[in-house]
Design a protein with these regions (language model features):
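N-terminal segment immediately downstream of the Sec signal-peptide cleavage site
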Residues: 34-82
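N-linked glycosylation sites
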Residues: 51-52, 56, 96, 152, ...
Length: 259
């Protein structure tokens, strides 16, 4: 059966909206895990391709988790999210690491490092951290998603509700938020100020941050909305590239911890 969302996205002439990407992700990710992976101790590199999209890969051979991916997608859609992962993605964790789930009220810091580079033509997407949370420690389907974007030329889900809300890691962030109805959870996205929908995917960069900074902000400014509380459990932290178009390559490497 033809995917009507994919058909609609394929006909677009502007960058794919995050709302459509969210719908696609909600329909496609669930419990089916496509794409190769490589375990690096407590973390793993995973070519999370959606709908069996062709994303080729080569994993780093040293002890630092990293990978290069290359692909050729002419039209806009959400083809995958190759990423470095620590924790339980929808209850799946081939590294069997036990750092997560971790209750945020009992967590003092979540130090993360993330570096990336890319090259090619018509490249589009977003280099981003992706985090899933639950109200319990069941290692199961997410009940909240929090994203922190770095270099991008895309659009977050929902609408912008905050400008210059915090500064860390060399960026000042805006906040976007909205409901991913297809996936069944709410999404908060912190994105570098003024970068939503910019014309070009950056060819290199990085984002080294303490993720607890973002959760502290949500506790102070969004806990009354009912979507987030520091009593929630963090299931997973991922750092990678949401691939939405291009003929080229990307490299990602990351290290994720929590105390």
């Amino acid at each position: 059966m033809e995917n009507p969302l994919a058909a609609a996205v394929g006909s677009r002439r502007a960058p794919l909206s995050r709302s459509l990407m969210g719908l696609l992700a909600g329909l496609l990710c669930s419990t089916a895990y496509a794409g190769p992976f490589q375990v690096y101790g407590s973390e793993f590199a995973w070519v999370n391709n959606f709908n069996n999209s062709t994303i080729n890969s080569s994993f780093s051979t040293n002890s630092v988790p990293g990978m290069t991916v290359w692909y050729n997608f002419a039209s806009f859609s959400l083809y995958g999210y190759p990423a470095i992962v620590r924790g339980w993605h929808y209850g799946w964790n081939p590294a069997n690491d036990t750092l997560f789930p971790k209750q945020l009220s009992a967590t003092s810091s979540i130090p993360c490092t993330f570096s990336y580079s890319s090259g090619g033509s018509n490249m589009a997407g977003d280099f981003a951290y992706d985090m899933f949370l639950r109200w319990d420690n069941a290692r199961s389907t997410p009940q909240l998603e929090v994203m922190v974007w770095a270099g991008n030329d895309s659009w977050p889900i929902g609408s912008q509700t905050g400008t210059n809300v915090l500064t860390t890691g060399g960026f000042t962030f805006d906040l976007w938020e909205g409901n991913n109805s297809a996936a069944g959870y709410y999404v908060y996205t912190f994105i570098p100020h003024g970068t939503a929908g910019q014309g070009n995917l950056p060819t290199g960069g990085g984002l080294n941050v303490d993720m607890k900074t973002f959760f502290n902000w949500l506790q102070a400014h969004r806990s009354n909305a009912g979507h987030y509380s520091n009593s929630m459990y963090l299931d997973v932290v991922e750092a990678g590239l949401e691939v939405t178009r291009g003929n080229g390559w990307a490299f990602v490497t990351a290290n994720i911890n929590a105390h």
